[in-house]
């Protein structure tokens, strides 16, 4: 669990601080020296446009590891006193492996993204955004008011 401060993102202030439970599955965690390197295995083809989203995903995993209890870490075979120093991802179809040091900007970005999601939740602001690859397969499509607009069809 982490605390998202009401002022995490000044552009999207929250009404109060929130305790957020993080949950996810990390594909692999490697130990290198005195630190850990989580690795994500991905399907699909690598493209450079995926760099920023991958960094955010890995920053989420770093938050998850570093805010887990000692018992949870030990159960997963991890030493509680070691930090995540790097992160990595692997796209087998493209034979692409990337490893880099943790980026502070990515850590800040993922916290702000969580704050923005809470901000939207508090205000019930979830505007529909059409994307042809996903909207057509959404189970909500048939009753989505925005999906029925003439400009989408």
Regions found by a protein language model. Name each.
Residues 1-153:
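RecB-family 4Fe-4S metal-dependent nuclease core
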